[in-house]
C-alpha cells in the first residue's frame, strides 16, 4: 500500500507528505539546480493535497 512520507523526507509535492505536513522548498527561488524539498510541519502552511480535503 502507498504510504505517506514523514517529516524531513524529500518530497515532490504536498501529496507525498503525510497529512499535517507540507512539501517545503526553501531554495526554490535561489538555487533551482539543487532544489531540495522536504516534508515540514510549519504552522503557517497547510497540506493542499486533494486526498486530505475534508468532505
Swiss-Prot record:
Q: What is its main location?
A: secreted
Q: Please, which domain of life does this record's source organism belong to?
A: Eukaryota
Looking up InterPro entries in the UniProt record yields:
OXYTX_ICK
Q: Which Gene Ontology molecular function entries are recorded, alphabetically?
A: calcium channel regulator activity; toxin activity
Q: In this chain, where does the modification Serine amide occur?
A: 55
Q: Does the keyword DNA-binding apply?
A: no
Family assignment? Belongs to the spiderine family. Spiderine subfamily.
Give the function comment from the record: Weak blocker of vertebrate P/Q-, N- and L-type voltage-gated calcium channels (Cav1 and Cav2). Is both paralytic and lethal when injected into lepidopteran larvae. Is not toxic to mice.
Q: What's the protein here called?
A: Omega-oxotoxin-Ol1b
Native species of this protein? Oxyopes lineatus (Lynx spider)
Amino acid at each position: 500500500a502507498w504510504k505517506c512520507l514523514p517529516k524531513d523526507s524529500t518530497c515532490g509535492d504536498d501529496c507525498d507528505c503525510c497529512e499535517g505536513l507540507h512539501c517545503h522548498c526553501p531554495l526554490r527561488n535561489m538555487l533551482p539546480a539543487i532544489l531540495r524539498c522536504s516534508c515540514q510541519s510549519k504552522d503557517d502552511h497547510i497540506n493542499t493535497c486533494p486526498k486530505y480535503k475534508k468532505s
